[in-house]
Design a protein with these regions (language model features):
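Phosphate/diphosphate ligand-binding glycine-rich loop within oxidoreductases
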Residues: 2-117
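Residues at the starts of beta-strands that form the adenosine-phosphate
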Residues: 3, 32, 125, 148-149
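Glycine-rich adenosine-cofactor-binding loop
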Residues: 8, 104-107, 114-115, 122-147, ...
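Conserved acidic residues
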Residues: 56, 148, 180-183
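Short, charged/polar "capping" segments at the starts of alpha-helices
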Residues: 67, 157-162, 192-195
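NAD(P)-binding Rossmann-fold cofactor-contacting core
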Residues: 145-170
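Rossmann-like adenosine-cofactor binding region
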Residues: 169-200
């Protein structure tokens, strides 16, 4: 029986095992899909288990989408996203050796979801709330869809800049503004990172 995992921290909330195991059962596939909470120091061991055939595939969620990259033999992702969410073994037909390959399905998944509802964002203003692990992939997908402006809002300026500055080749400007709001009796600072495409 094949074994698949989703790794992250935290991971208790993940519904991936329920979805995948249902799909396996409905399609008569002899496989099991589990979730595993790990630390960054565990990544090497997990990849070794995969290389040795104990694990057949891995999905990766926060906060490890970037930190798994040094353990891979090959990546099939846009380099500037620096985000891997799927890992699998690729067998060399000549030597018989296994390569551990990382892919990013966030990009095509986001594109397909918009395509499914037949919604075009060309020329529209886009607002992204949060700069988590999937954000660089979403920005990459959006850039190919030609919106007029992409605005990224995050609690910390540094993380917003890290997610946005990957795309300096397509940016017209970066504006960082501060807005103060009352929150639980304290003054909370929120920083807004604004990314804009060059006008054509």
């Amino acid at each position: 029986m094949k074994k698949y995992l989703v790794i992250g921290n935290p991971i208790d909330h993940s519904l991936s095992p329920r979805l995948h195991n249902y799909w396996f059962k409905e399609n008569n596939i002899k496989a099991v899909y589990e979730k595993k909470q790990i630390r960054e120091s565990d990544i090497g061991g997990i990849i070794s288990e995969m290389r040795n055939g104990k694990i057949d595939g891995i999905n990766v969620t926060v906060p490890f989408k970037k930190s798994v990259i040094p353990f891979l033999d090959k990546m099939q992702i846009p380099e500037k996203t620096q985000s891997v969410n799927t890992i699998y073994r690729e067998k060399n037909k000549v030597t018989g050796s296994n390569k551990i390959v990382g892919r990013n399905t966030d990009i095509i998944g986001f594109k397909n979801s918009l395509g499914h509802i037949k919604y075009s964002i060309k020329g529209k203003k886009i607002f992204i709330l949060g700069a988590g692990g999937v954000t660089p992939s979403i920005i990459y997908a959006l850039e190919e869809m030609e919106p007029s402006v992409i605005m990224l809002c995050n609690r910390t300026k540094e993380k917003a800049q890290k997610a946005g500055l990957i795309y300096t080749d397509t940016q017209k400007k970066i504006n960082v503004n501060k807005k103060r709001n009352a929150h639980n009796g304290h003054r909370a600072t929120r920083r807004f990172q604004s990314l804009a495409k060059p006008e054509k």
